[in-house]
């Protein structure tokens, strides 16, 4: 499209002092005559384009205009490019790739190596191990509904195993701790809710539009639906040396109270008391022991007993 070509041409001219018309024609796969017509269009838009003849000549933006256009420092461009790369590991629309290439073209030639070094300094991949294309397709489908302000329906299974058909007004896709969630207004509960994407099935985009309510994402307590203080239970556990690293990663090493490196440690941790809790504790196997509270200890023992009966048959 002409508009995209004009924008790309301006971005390219911002980063380079002079570009030959033939080079632009080859890059954008149009004729040299078309390039000169585009230059006239850009001039009429208020961006002063000049041409110069001879060796080293070509098409460029007027030097006096250069100071006005330098509104982003190189360090800021590096940061934007790194952020785009990180987002692309989780969500890959064409616009992100195009935006990255445009940012790349803004970097002066003398800073190309510095740009490469800075964008390779960090590599953030928030996708889950063994993630499937189904999850990516689901995210893109929800994103399309958000863009078009269309309600969606899906079958949702909660952590407790309850399955319901939900109809929602989708607001925001949230990636937290490697998992994707949808923040949406639930028309069944008449309130905002979080929905874990891997618990959704049979998602459909409906033809009913909605008016987006004003929300402030930066003030939303993303842990609120799970990590509420009134739902937390304080647990006292014994931790074998083999589990010390994993407990430290989850809760911080300051919760571990040990006398010697090879000794069993005691830890005091706080977690929501729900169906998830017992499964979380059992993942550590024989490497931890719940001391308190007694009702949680009994639930762990009961679950282990049921598991033993299953494997004995």
Swiss-Prot record:
Lineage summary: Bacteria, Bacillati, Bacillota, Bacilli, Bacillales
UniProt key word ATP-binding: no
Q: What is this protein called?
A: Uncharacterized HTH-type transcriptional regulator YobV
Query: What Pfam family is a match for this entry?
Result: HTH_11
Main location, first listed in the record? cytoplasm
Every WYL domain range: 131-210
Q: Which GO terms describe its molecular function?
A: DNA binding; DNA-binding transcription factor activity
A GO CC annotation given for this chain: cytoplasm
Q: Where in the cell is it found?
A: Cytoplasm
DNA-binding residues per UniProt? Answer: 19-38
**Where is the HTH deoR-type domain positioned along the sequence?**
2-57
Keyword field contains DNA-binding: yes
Which InterPro entries does the UniProt entry name for this protein?
Answer: CBASS_pafABC_assoc_protein, DeoR_HTH, HTH_11, PafC, WH-like_DNA-bd_sf, WH_DNA-bd_sf, WYL_dom
Swiss-Prot/TrEMBL keywords: Cytoplasm, DNA-binding, Repressor, Transcription, Transcription regulation
Per the UniProt record, the source organism is Bacillus subtilis (strain 168)
């Amino acid at each position: 499209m002409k508009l995209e070509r004009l924008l790309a041409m301006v971005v390219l001219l911002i980063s380079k002092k002079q570009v030959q018309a033939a080079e632009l024609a080859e890059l954008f796969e149009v004729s040299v005559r078309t390039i000169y017509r585009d230059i006239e269009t850009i001039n009429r838009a208020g961006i002063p384009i000049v041409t110069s003849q001879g060796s080293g000549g070509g098409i460029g933006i007027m030097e006096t205009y250069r100071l006005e256009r330098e509104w982003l420092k190189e360090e800021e461009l590096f940061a934007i490019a790194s952020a785009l790369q990180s987002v692309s590991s989780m969500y890959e629309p064409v616009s992100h790739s195009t935006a990255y290439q445009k940012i790349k073209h803004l970097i002066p030639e003398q800073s190309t190596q510095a740009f490469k070094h800075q964008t390779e300094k960090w590599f953030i991949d928030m996708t889950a191990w063994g993630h499937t294309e189904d999850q990516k397709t689901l995210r893109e489908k929800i994103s399309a509904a958000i863009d078009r302000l269309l309600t969606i329906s899906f079958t949702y299974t909660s952590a407790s195993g309850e399955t319901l058909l939900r109809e929602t007004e989708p607001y925001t896709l949230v990636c937290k701790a490697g998992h994707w969630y949808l923040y949406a207004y639930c028309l069944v509960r008449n309130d905002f809710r979080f929905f874990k994407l891997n618990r959704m099935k049979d998602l459909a985009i409906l033809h009913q539009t909605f008016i987006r309510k004003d929300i402030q994402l930066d003030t939303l307590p993303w842990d609120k639906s799970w990590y509420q203080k009134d739902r937390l239970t304080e647990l006292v556990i014994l931790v074998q040396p083999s589990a010390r690293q994993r407990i430290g990663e989850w809760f911080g090493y300051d919760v571990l109270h040990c006398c010697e490196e090879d000794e069993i440690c005691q830890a005091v941790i706080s977690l929501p008391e729900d169906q998830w809790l017992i499964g979380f504790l059992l993942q550590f196997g024989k490497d931890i022991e719940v001391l308190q509270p007694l009702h949680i200890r009994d639930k762990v023992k009961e679950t282990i007993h049921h598991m033993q009966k299953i494997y004995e048959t």
